[in-house]
């Protein structure tokens, strides 16, 4: 069963499932980030401004990654297709990089703690990625090798990559593929739970930025695992680029956590301490309640 990528047509306007899911993912991620910001004592209203800025940077970065990936196959001869984002084709590694650059610029301009805010955004990012992966099902992207498992999915001829373009050997009606996008979505949801748990369980021991580094470790390992099964990989030097990025992200994320803690390059539980200091300051600034007047003693008579 194949789904029409266009969810709704209104005259000349086509609304694609990919765009709808992108919007749902962004709102869901912002909702979670808002809750995390409040829990950490930050201004939750900043989340929506950051969402717009990070979304622009993320779309540019993810599209650029995809275009470079598919340049020889698609865009060299059809450069006009580069701007047709609604047809799919967004690379998450590029999106993360673009969003991080945009968010760094926003926090610098507004004098906010960049590391603390990417901690707030890390679980939200995984949630958004999990939801966005459903779009890969609609667009028939991010699938693995053929499988006989009951949850295998069909892929039509137009979206096949070699050697699965040979329909005599891999008929459309009887060949089903691993839904790698679904595996990633489930692992991302598990990652959301892990990051939220770590952020709460070890709050007094974590430095600002630790949760974000854990995001890179988690997602890097997930992508490395799944890319070993993916078809149509972008390969450099015989190694899929996504695996290089995944391994690099996981190693760097883990190294940053270990080195910072070994050298004491941070303040454990910084946001908790600041919240406690603010509460203490507010308590001192609040004048004590005036004592109630004593009731007159009854006269003897």
Identify the residue ranges that each predicted region occupies.
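A feature for loop-to-transmembrane-helix boundaries and adjacent hydrophobic helices
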Residues: 1-301
């Amino acid at each position: 069963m194949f789904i029409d990528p266009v969810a709704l047509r209104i005259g000349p306007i086509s609304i694609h499932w990919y765009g709808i899911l992108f919007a749902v993912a962004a709102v869901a991620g912002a909702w979670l980030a808002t809750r995390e910001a409040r829990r950490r004592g930050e201004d939750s209203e900043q989340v929506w401004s950051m969402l717009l800025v990070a979304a622009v940077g993320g779309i540019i970065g993810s599209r650029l990654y995809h275009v470079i990936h598919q340049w020889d196959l698609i865009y060299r001869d059809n450069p006009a297709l580069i701007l047709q984002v609604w047809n799919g084709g967004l690379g998450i590694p590029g999106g993360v990089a673009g969003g991080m650059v945009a968010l760094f610029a926003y926090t610098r301009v507004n004098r906010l703690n960049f590391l603390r805010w990417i901690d707030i955004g890390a679980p939200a990012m995984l949630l958004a990625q999990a939801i966005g992966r459903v779009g890969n099902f609609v667009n028939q992207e991010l699938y693995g090798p053929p499988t006989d498992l009951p949850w295998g999915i069909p892929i039509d001829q137009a979206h096949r990559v070699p050697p699965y373009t040979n329909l005599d050997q891999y008929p459309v009606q009887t060949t089903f593929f691993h839904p790698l996008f679904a595996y990633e979505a489930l692992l991302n949801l598990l990652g959301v739970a892990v990051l939220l748990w770590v952020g709460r369980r070890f709050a007094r021991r974590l430095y600002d930025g630790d949760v974000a580094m854990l995001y890179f470790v988690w997602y890097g390992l997930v992508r490395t695992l799944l890319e070993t099964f993916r078809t149509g990989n972008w390969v450099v030097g015989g190694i899929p680029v996504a695996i290089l990025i995944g391994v690099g992200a996981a190693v760097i994320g883990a190294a940053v956590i270990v080195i910072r803690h070994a050298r004491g390059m941070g303040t454990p539980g910084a946001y908790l301490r600041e919240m406690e200091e603010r509460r203490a300051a507010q308590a001192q600034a609040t004048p004590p309640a005036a004592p109630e007047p004593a009731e007159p003693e009854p006269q003897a008579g």
